[in-house]
């Protein structure tokens, strides 16, 4: 599945498809508004995976399928698959996710799912329920990893890169294990690997997503082709010192675990700034005993590092580890590292990148190519050799993962039209070169 034939005649070939399968972007906007009103509060979206609100969103989405000639089911990893059977078993998959971070935005993930639903709907109408190739839409389970720190849960199970033994004992802030949360949603953790069965006949994967950054707005461009996703190293780091009374312990006698962690939090900034596309974040800090009258005896932190270059990513990680040991020594503490998750940089398929470029230019008149810093399910799909590409739509003020997340509604409409064109072009290539 790793090769797609690409020829200069593809634009002419796909023009016939563009006379059909017309999407209605306003339907996508109405559905987005409806989902927001159903699953958000004054703080933002609350569709955190493995929670009642997430299940409510999925039940709402199931209602949207009742008028379509699609089969739908949940696989062993709780990914929701919708299939519009075609004349051929060769399959185009469109995917994204309905889950959100706590207090999240109204577009992250769900835009791709609802745009995909509209593309499926349009093809079903124009081909009387049976397009030339099979089309599938997938709502991946727990893309965000917000509750347990394990991103891309469902798509990594699909790709065969997820080992549940390393994750079943992960806990959320309330102490609930990942295994217990999954069981509460009807998922048998020992059967998650069976999700790989869904790979059969998939020849390409497409995903539409908001940019979640400031670049497109700065360039005054509505849409972009995504070149690939950055590699990620995600670690839990714990500094161990000595709890002591804050009033009676001299400064020179303290073994302050938080002081060591704070030094590392500052040090990762210059480590990342050495490289133009690198980022590093310490996004979580827990102190123990966590009271105002005690020196911190234990400090638990997380580190997230990303870059497109695997060598640079490894160098950054090495420098961060060395710095943590140095700062632990300075504060007379110890430090331990525990890996949460990692993924290598993933380039997307060059032929699909070209088709995506064409679809964007034909829709918006101008395009851009960007790497993706945020993680996406598309990376897990691409890493197993399925030709993959993503399309970005501009984010306002570069904000995401909070209630201020927004995109110009006209740009959303353009994105839906361009994404539909991309699906048409992909199938057009297959029609010419089956």
Task: Identify the meaning behind each predicted range.
Residues 227, 245, 249-274, 317, ...:
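His/Asp/Glu-rich mid-to-C-terminal helical/loop segments that flank catalytic regions of hydrolases
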Residues 94, 103-144, 233-239, 245-271, ...:
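Alpha-helical metal-binding/catalytic segments enriched in His/Glu/Asp
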Residues 46-50, 281-290, 302-308, 334-353, ...:
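A short beta-alpha structural unit
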Residues 40-85:
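A non-catalytic alpha/beta surface segment that caps or lines the substrate-entry region
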Residues 29, 37-38, 176-227, 265-270, ...:
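Active-site-adjacent substrate-binding region
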Residues 28-38, 92-96, 297, 367-421:
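Zn-dependent metallopeptidase/amidohydrolase metal-coordination segment
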Residues 11-52, 399-400:
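N-terminal capping segment at the start of a domain
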Residues 142-143, 147-310:
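Midchain, well-structured core segments that form catalytic/ion-binding scaffolds
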